[in-house]
Amino acid sequence: MYNEIINYIKNKNVAILGFGREGKSTYKFIRKHLKDKMLTVLDQNKNATSDINDDNLILINDNYLDY
């Protein structure tokens, strides 16, 4: 089942809406299987990803629901 999910998202643009418990879990899953995948996190908290050092991660927080 995991391989189906990975194959489905590997050539898609991926955005994670919200970086709470589920968002972080999703991020960790994708990073485990697709280490260089560009990801976008949309969260109202400007410090949501402050503890993550990842060059392939974009955080959008101002007006994040407009994207």
What does each model-identified segment do?
Residues M1-Y67:
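N-terminal leader/targeting and accessory segments in enzymes
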